[in-house]
Amino acid sequence: MRLEFFEVMAKKIHFIGICGVAMSALALAFKRQGWKVTGSDVGFYPPVSTHLKEAGIDFYPGWHPEKINKPDLVVVGNVASSTNPEWLYVQEHKLNYKSYPEVIAEYFVKKNSIVCAGTYGKTTSTALLTWILKEAGFDPNYMFGGLMAMPTNGAYINTPLQFFSSPSQTVPP
């Protein structure tokens, strides 16, 4: 049975590779929806580390399978090679996992979504479109791999009615 994003509260999710701009935005969106969020990566630097810390997300440097505490879902980033200890742990313990594109496709993209695609300017176009709609009185959901001058940075989830995305070549067909 498919879990609908807005029906699930107080779940646990772990991100392997949480420090990227897009993965951290996704982690922040789940946190704002009430999920317990944890993550790992090889390096943490401002402003991403600052946003994660301010949101109360537990994250740690390196790969430590023993710190993965029975999550309902593991999001596996591109940084997880076939020899990554956390990725091996997820497979060995048969934990529920998805890639970043799979999470976007399942939880965010709806039939009335708008995805800004192209070679250059996707993040800027998505942020500008989001700002225009907010100024016009709409409250769209959005997700993009960039840090903008918005209180929610690269992700905001309110309702499943409107969603804007900058896919960065990651949204499946």
Say what each PLM segment does.
Residues 42-43, 64, 102-103:
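Short, ordered loop/turn segments at secondary-structure junctions
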Residues 1-45, 53-59, 70-74, 92-95:
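ATP-dependent carboxylate-amine ligase
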Residues 60-63, 82:
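Conserved beta-strand-loop-alpha-helix hinge of the TIR/SEFIR fold
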Residues 23, 45-46, 83, 126:
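Generic non-transmembrane alpha-helix signal with a bias for helix starts/N-cap capping motifs
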Residues 4-8, 29, 53, 67, ...:
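Phosphate-binding loop of NTP-binding sites
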Residues 47, 63, 70, 151:
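Short acidic active-site motifs
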